[in-house]
């Protein structure tokens, strides 16, 4: 548990889930509640060259990673900053070996971890359909504030059509988002409460 009222997945749980994943070139992987980015970054720790190829001054992603998190105030925004800092740490060896890719990395870095500030819904305000081959996540599980989220969804026609709004709590909304965001045949590894 963190001072910011957020819960982060223990690293041993992240690693156990990541070890179950089968990766292939061209995959698009997402964590819709990425926090500090561990579900997306842990797979690259031991196999960085499977994810990124360097050709001259070009950094070419072989697998696309996308992490979303929400942030209205400075404390919430720190989480996505930490995800980007983690990415820099995980890729520091590659950058050190290839100093010409720093601008490419800066773009990748900002395209990978995206802060959602436009709505209390965060990622849920992005009605994505059949975009990802793999989703790895530990979405938030809270009941308080869920009615506010459902009210916000009800105000927006596109979101009202996207969500059934019958889900209990924010975790139900995230589960619905995950199912809709997966490509046909895609897989999701989701931490759920007991």
Language model feature labels by segment:
Residues 125-126, 130-133, 146, 175, ...:
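Charge-dense, intrinsically disordered terminal/linker segments
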Residues 145-167, 194:
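A mobile, often basic/glycine-rich helix-loop segment
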Residues 137:
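A short beta-strand submotif of the Rossmann-like class I SAM-dependent methyltransferase core
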Residues 164-194:
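Conserved Class I SAM-dependent methyltransferase catalytic core
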Residues 1-2:
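Long recognition/docking surfaces used for binding and targeting
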Residues 9-130, 134, 142, 192-194:
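Conserved S-adenosyl-L-methionine
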Residues 141-152, 178-185:
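A glycine-rich, aromatic-flanked flexible loop/lid motif
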